[in-house]
Amino acid sequence: MVKVAVTGALGRMGSGIIKTITETDGLDVVAAIDIPNHPKKGLDIGELTGLGKIGVLLSTSDELEDVLKESGAEVLVDFTAAAPCVNTAKTASKLGVNLVIGTTGFTPEQRAEMEKAISENKVAATISQNYAVGVNIFFKTLELLAQKLGDYDIEILEMHHKFKKDAPSGTALRAAEIIQNNLNRDSNLIYGREGITGERTKEEICIHALRGGDIVGDHTVIFTTEGERLELSHRVTSRQSLVSGAIRAIQFVADKKEGIYNTFDVLDLN
């Protein structure tokens, strides 16, 4: 039985992961953690997420080290925000706890700080902007399209719910990274357009971020040239697709000794 701690336990992703862990053979929720001074601290996380009592009380991130030690957690799952996630990763890795990280919005410095802690403490971690299986097939397909349609104009469009705090999305940035790594030409990433921009240059890859309503996550990459347009789209209609992917990542990383992995590793797409 793999003992799992979940941060952001009452968030949209955290609560979904907790529910699915309780339905998954071989996994057990041993700690549920949320922000300091949370008003529901000390209440049963099962009752808070509609499962009924499961015997795990909500704790807070200011007591993370003690919670991880007392619970014996082997894997910690973090879908929160960049700054607290870095601190969580540093604490967990110091204690030898493996990680599944789905948080987005890291600065390069934050990402480097987190990866340094993981490497120095010789734990294993999967880090991904999107754990949905379909979106990773989307990423893999982008490798081929960028290689074969590298002389086309390329634009990226992403849409999310009005509550999303970072833009562009981590998934859109990952798509852009994959495209740039597979183009046989120079490229320049830009974000939206405004005013008199002049003609579009061949090097431009532009990301457009839309926000509104309850959109879980839509991503489209458009390859266009004179006479034709190819669009590759992925749409998440339920967070359960992300939750299911995170569960796979927990199972994958649980028995790994050390290393930093991504969802291509989890899904054997490399």
UniProtKB/Swiss-Prot annotation:
Its main location: cytoplasm. Its EC number is 1.17.1.8. Transmembrane segments: none annotated. It catalyses: (S)-2,3,4,5-tetrahydrodipicolinate + NAD(+) + H2O = (2S,4S)-4-hydroxy-2,3,4,5-tetrahydrodipicolinate + NADH + H(+); (S)-2,3,4,5-tetrahydrodipicolinate + NADP(+) + H2O = (2S,4S)-4-hydroxy-2,3,4,5-tetrahydrodipicolinate + NADPH + H(+). (S)-2,3,4,5-tetrahydrodipicolinate binds at residues 161, 170-171. It comes from the Archaea. The keyword Amino-acid biosynthesis applies. The active site is at residues 160, 164. One of its GO terms (cellular component) is cytoplasm. NAD(+) binds at residues 8-13, 34, 102-104, 128-131. It is found in: Cytoplasm. It holds the Pfam family DapB_C. PROSITE patterns: DAPB. Gene3D superfamilies: Dihydrodipicolinate Reductase, domain 2 (3.30.360.10), NAD(P)-binding Rossmann-like Domain (3.40.50.720). GO terms for molecular function: 4-hydroxy-tetrahydrodipicolinate reductase; NAD binding; NADP binding; oxidoreductase activity, acting on CH or CH2 groups, NAD or NADP as acceptor. The keyword Magnesium does not apply. InterPro entries: DapB_C (IPR022663), DapB_N (IPR000846), DapB_N_CS (IPR022664), DHDPR_bac (IPR023940), NAD(P)-bd_dom_sf (IPR036291). Keywords: Amino-acid biosynthesis, Cytoplasm, Diaminopimelate biosynthesis, Lysine biosynthesis, NAD, NADP, Oxidoreductase. GO terms for biological process: diaminopimelate biosynthetic process; lysine biosynthetic process via diaminopimelate. Pathway: Amino-acid biosynthesis; L-lysine biosynthesis via DAP pathway; (S)-tetrahydrodipicolinate from L-aspartate: step 4/4. Belongs to the DapB family. Catalyzes the conversion of 4-hydroxy-tetrahydrodipicolinate (HTPA) to tetrahydrodipicolinate. This is 4-hydroxy-tetrahydrodipicolinate reductase. The gene is dapB.
